[in-house]
Amino acid sequence: MSRQLSILIFIIFALVNSYANAGDDGNLKLNENKNGYVEVGDCFEKVNRGIFGFNQVLDKVNFKPLAKGYRIFPQPIRSGTSNALSNIGNVVTIPNNVLQGQFKDAGLNSARFVINSTLGIAGIFDVASYYGIKKRDKEDYGQTLGVWGAGPGCYFVLPVLGPTTIRDSIGSVVNMIGGDAWYNVTVANDTQYFSEADYYASRLLSGVDFRAKNLESFDSLENSSVDLYASVRSLYLQDRYRKIRNIDKTTDTLSDDDWEELDTQ
């Protein structure tokens, strides 16, 4: 059985499970709490908490020190890095704009990508914003599935990668079978210009950049939370709910772009 067919079977199985809570009329019966956010089942909580604890140790030993070291670099260098990573992210955002019917945003993001990739020197400089083409909301395949009506399925925690749901994990699989142009240029089609190492280096840099932006936020969350695992789960699920419905509202602790690197599964 080919790798692509195996992945397709997994997607179908997971989608069936994500629709398991649909009523007889086919409409999803999602439970919303008093804040309006969908409550997602934590089907593997004991395992999730164990993996979360492992990730916390990994963060303290590796990512947090790397993030602190990264902050030594001058702000212009860090801003340029963030801009370049955001520019690469457009290769996932643009097709999802189209899939969600956001054709205006697809056009604007395409213009941003072309301008910043050329005049902005591989996206290091946000020239498009200078010309009035402002950064749009990031989209991904997990969000698209949500817009199409797929339920989130169970919440779970992945080693190293952190929080996700069945639906968002399917979005990550879509990247591997053609949805992420950057992945396909580097990993799937190793060329003389880009290699698999370039892709994974960019993902590692994304994680370090994300962590560096949120050193104080995470410290504050850790110090103020009675149950850190539950707090992170709540923040992640609220953020995903908000992005799928394009709600202009931030979570209690983290800023609007805080989870963007975690969303690119």
Residue ranges and their predicted role:
Residues 8-16:
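Bacterial N-terminal signal peptides
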Residues 16-24:
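Sec/Tat signal peptide C-region and signal peptidase I cleavage site
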Residues 36-47, 59:
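Short, membrane-interfacial amphipathic segments enriched in basic
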Residues 46-47, 76-83, 106-116:
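Alpha-helical scaffold segments that form or flank carboxylate-/histidine-based iron centers
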Residues 87-166:
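Mid-length scaffold segments of soluble, non-membrane domains
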